[in-house]
Amino acid sequence: QNANIYVDDTPAINVFELRAKCRRLAKQGIDLIVIDYLQLMSGSTEKGGNREQEISQISRALKGLAKELDVPVIALSQLSRAVETRGGVKRPQLSDLRESGAIEQDADMVIFLYRPEYYGITENEDGSDARGTAEVIIAKNRHGAIQTVRLRFLDKFAKFTNKDAKVLPPEAEQETRTFSSRINDDDDILGGLSPKTDDAPF
């Protein structure tokens, strides 16, 4: 209950509402903003644009928000169905980002999670066993190297560990508690004011 974690589950929140709430929270000090996930957000209320243009607007707005508040913004994104229909290797690529190339352009880093076993692949290209493994693919890194890191994936716990890490039985693991405070349950977080929907996203 003392953790500084704020959860906002407003359905189809738009970029203007999000920015207004983040600005309020910034006065109390925030270190990270996580969007889960980008395609669930809505853009401006203007009509006439398609979904790809709307996602592009959201992506640019999140980039502007990160710069304005000087905090990292992690935005989860869906992948295109083309990954599943593609023959051969199913490893995700930048072109698989759904509905917008703007995500690739705006992001400083793009990281994919890939589990070969999910697609029925049991052997990696180098001949190593792919079962129970996952890859963290750094597909874009504006400030560093592009590389892939292999991890162990424990499907029973939906947990990632280092490949050579010793796995403890569940009863031996330290109890973990999750704390959160909900933005929408705190009437004072926006000072009783509604965000201005006519404000520019960035």
What is the meaning of each model-derived region?
Residues 54-55, 93:
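Charged, low-complexity surface patches
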